[in-house]
């Protein structure tokens, strides 16, 4: 029954992704017009959704208790990174692929994909836990992940902590989260019309995100996907090692059951889409990064129902 519930929860997501794929094939979305969707999600729908959901869900005391759970994703992701570091050297990967491999191994698309997937599986009560994981994921990706990918490229390596890193961490969704937290801690309510506006705009998040994933999948040639040792290692890292790391770390902390389930689903999501962007920026192996993002996206559709059955 749990497996079937997970399948049912994912069916709407699969349909929306398929719609994005089909419409792209019919010419509705071009490379230029498709750029609008992630911009709408990143700058409009996700920030407003965070403001509405957090203010709608949490009191001051409840939020302080919630935030203590961030230690679980931080520790589990650091464990996954250390394992990816060892594996990338043991597998003798090409120098321009090691950092990309590590980032795809330990960082997931915890917001762009995480919000709609967890909403489908657990409902609105899961969103605060999704955001907690997102904070840890965003900080570690834009510091350790960004630095690792920069070592792959021909350009000068990025600094582990820099002004640019801070700007990327403080993205519009993060700022929406921060504003909501400030309002919660100061116990300042927003007018009903503002909350309603945030809710309506925030409801665009899931369909726009899923349409864009369909567009992205259409743009990747399946002939470029080869199941070599490092691709298999990334799949094992994303869908076996990282979820196990979360479960092990979570067993040492008294966190709510729903929080644990959300963290497991969050870590079993596709690699960050920004992995491909950074590979291009640093002149690393962009095609390799695109393949890892695509193949982890496809495998996540299979992995998520399985984890829903056992957690």
Label for each model-derived stretch:
Residues 1-311:
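Alpha-helical transmembrane segments of multi-pass small-molecule/ion transporters
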């Amino acid at each position: 029954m749990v497996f079937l519930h997970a399948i049912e929860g994912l069916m709407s997501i699969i349909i929306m992704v398929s719609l994005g794929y089909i419409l792209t094939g019919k010419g509705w979305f071009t490379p230029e017009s498709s750029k609008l969707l992630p911009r709408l999600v990143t700058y409009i729908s996700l920030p407003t959704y965070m403001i509405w959901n957090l203010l709608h869900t949490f009191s001051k005391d409840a939020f302080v208790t919630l935030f203590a759970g961030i230690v679980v994703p931080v520790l589990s992701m650091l464990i996954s990174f250390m394992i990816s570091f060892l594996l990338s050297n043991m597998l003798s990967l090409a120098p321009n692929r090691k950092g990309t491999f590590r980032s795809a191994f330990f960082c997931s698309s915890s917001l762009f994909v995480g919000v709609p997937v967890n909403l489908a599986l657990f409902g609105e009560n899961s969103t605060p836990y999704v955001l907690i994981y997102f904070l840890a994921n965003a900080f570690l990706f834009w510091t350790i992940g960004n630095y690792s990918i920069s070592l792959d490229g021909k350009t000068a390596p990025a600094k582990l902590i820099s002004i640019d890193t801070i700007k990327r961490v403080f993205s519009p969704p993060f700022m929406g989260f921060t504003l909501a937290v400030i309002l919660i801690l100061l116990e300042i309510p927003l007018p009903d019309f503002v909350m309603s506006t945030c809710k309506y705009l925030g409801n665009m998040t899931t369909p726009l995100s899923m349409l864009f994933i369909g567009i992205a999948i259409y743009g990747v040639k399946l002939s470029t996907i080869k199941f070599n040792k490092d691709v298999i290692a990334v799949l094992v890292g994303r869908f076996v090692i990282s979820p196990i790391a979360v479960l092990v770390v979570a067993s040492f902390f008294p966190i709510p059951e729903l929080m644990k389930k959300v963290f497991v689903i969050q870590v079993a999501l596709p690699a960050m889409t920004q992995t491909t962007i950074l590979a291009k920026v640093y002149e690393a192996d962009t095609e390799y990064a695109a393949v890892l993002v695509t193949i982890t996206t496809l495998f996540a559709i299979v992995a998520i129902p399985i984890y829903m059955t056992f957690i």
